[in-house]
Amino acid sequence: MFGRIGLPEILLILAIALIIFGPKKLPELGKALGSSLREFKSATKELREEVNEVEEEVKENKSSDVKENEDNKTEKST
């Protein structure tokens, strides 16, 4: 129920925006909203990529640490 915007809700929002801002300002607001959404998507994509890179580095470091610990245990037992 919450989080989903259907066609009736979008039409209501557009009607309210048309009443508040008028027909001349509406295209400008649409362009501004579109560019803002594009920038937001780009920023979230970059952030997601950085998080994935850090996760990979952590996995690599963790696996190399485990291998070093195993090597140290083997050296101590011999």
Swiss-Prot record:
Protein role: Part of the twin-arginine translocation (Tat) system that transports large folded proteins containing a characteristic twin-arginine motif in their signal peptide across membranes. TatA could form the protein-conducting channel of the Tat system.
One Gene Ontology term of the molecular function aspect: protein transmembrane transporter activity
Record-stated family: Belongs to the TatA/E family.
Disulfide bonds listed in the record: none
Alphabetized UniProt keyword annotations: Cell membrane, Membrane, Protein transport, Translocation, Transmembrane, Transmembrane helix, Transport
Keyword Nucleotide-binding attached: no
Identification of the protein by name: Sec-independent protein translocase protein TatA
Cellular-component GO terms for this entry: TAT protein transport complex
Xref: Pfam families: TatA_B_E
Membrane topology: Single-pass membrane protein
Subcellular location: Cell membrane
